[in-house]
Swiss-Prot record:
Identification of the protein by name: Forkhead box protein J1.2
Record-annotated DNA-binding residue ranges: 109-203
GO BP of this protein: cilium assembly; regulation of DNA-templated transcription
UniProt keyword annotations, A-Z: Activator, Cilium biogenesis/degradation, DNA-binding, Nucleus, Transcription, Transcription regulation
Record lineage: Eukaryota, Metazoa, Chordata, Craniata, Vertebrata
Length: 371
């Protein structure tokens, strides 16, 4: 086998021509032989890059396009060559939309849901109600796909008839022969089937989003929280004694709570601009607390007098007006007798009062109350 030696080497010009054809932008082998002093600038200025052939892509560089043999291309020359290459490429023609005959084509599944197929069968029938077998036969006659498909689609038809609210079952009459019941469209949802499409009705906005006022009332921080009613609880100690536990207003933040309107269950928050002065708020809190203590003492005295009389009296809910409690006319005594008798039970010792106050107080005031 012959071996190439230094005497059989190719000429230098031939090697350069071969290397130019094999070089690319990523090959830096030309940099070893390149020199600015030995380069003929006049030949580079007069040379023109060859136009790309039709077989080449618009973005592929021509063969031998390296930095050693010619200057970089300008954008104007490249922009002229690109349209010529794109013009030679064939453009795909838009395929026309072909209509599918579902009566004869068994390979394409109809683009209809099972509920839509049931509605189409009921609309095409002259009768008001159809049996399950009649729905099956209409679908197989009009759609060849279900004629040759697995019969599991019949289970889907039965499930849609049973679970979909658009269909209702009609029992068979005694004079009608045959077995099984009938199926028909519910008149309330008959408008949902329009032009072969079963539309879905949206829920009204009132069911999805309640009024904002109800949300604001429910989440208001100073409104009283609903608790189990304690009006019918009885406390028996010694003899027959009945006491009523009334809902007590909050003595700590009376100015921030919402006033209750008579004859209405809604509460409206007070104006935040009013009562913003802390001195007025403290004075108002002290005055209301004093009045509140006097009302509680009078109510406890009334319950004590009622228990000592030995009669079981059913106390009615007194009308509330301007946060004043009215004593019962029966067993009422003068103020001199009231002052002489000592008050046994204090308002702050009543069961559940401390829990009510701490529950309705804001977090920054609970620490001061506990201390």
């Amino acid at each position: 086998m012959p071996v190439l030696s230094t005497a059989h080497r190719l000429p230098l010009s031939v090697e350069r021509d071969c290397s130019r054809e094999d070089d690319s932008l990523t090959n830096l082998q030309w940099l070893q032989d390149f020199s600015i002093l030995s380069t003929d600038l006049s030949s580079i200025a007069n040379s023109r890059p060859p136009l790309p052939r039709a077989s080449q892509g618009p973005c592929s560089p021509p063969a031998g396009d390296t930095a050693s043999c010619q200057a970089p291309r300008t954008g104007k020359q490249r922009s002229v060559a690109v349209p010529t290459a794109w013009a030679s490429l064939p453009t795909p023609s838009p395929s026309p939309v072909q209509e599918v005959d579902y009566r004869t084509n068994a390979n394409i599944k109809p683009p209809y849901s099972y509920a839509t197929l049931i509605c189409m069968a009921m609309e095409a029938s002259q009768q008001r109600k159809l049996t399950l077998s009649a729905i099956y036969s209409w679908i197989t006659q009009n759609f060849c796909y279900y004629r040759h498909a697995d019969p599991s689609w019949q289970n889907s038809i039965r499930h849609n008839l049973s679970l979909n609210k658009c269909f209702m079952k009609v029992p068979r009459g005694k004079d009608e022969p045959g077995k099984g019941g009938f199926w028909q469209m519910d008149p309330r949802y008959a408008d949902m089937f329009v032009n072969g499409v079963l539309k879905r009705r949206r829920m009204p906005a009132s069911h999805l989003d309640p009024p904002r006022c109800n949300k604001a009332i429910a989440h208001h921080p100073y409104l009283p929280v609903s608790r189990p009613s304690s009006h019918h609880m009885q406390h028996i100690s010694g003899g027959h004694r009945q006491s009523r536990r009334y809902e007590k207003p909050n003595p700590v933040l009376p100015a921030l709570r919402a006033p209750e309107r008579q004859g209405d269950a809604l509460f409206t928050p007070e104006d935040p601009l009013q009562g913003s002065n802390f001195d007025d708020l403290d004075l108002q809190t002290a005055l209301i607390s004093m009045c509140w203590e006097g009302d509680l003492a009078a109510s406890n005295l009334n319950s004590t007098l009622t228990g000592t009389s030995g009669m079981d009296m059913n106390l009615q809910d007194p009308p509330m007006q301007d946060n004043h409690w009215y004593l019962s006319t029966e067993g009422q005594q003068t103020w001199e007798q009231v002052k002489e008798e000592p008050v046994v039970e204090q308002w702050y010792n009543e069961t559940g009062f401390v829990e009510d106050v701490l529950y309705e107080c804001p977090p920054w005031e609970r620490v001061e109350t506990l201390l």
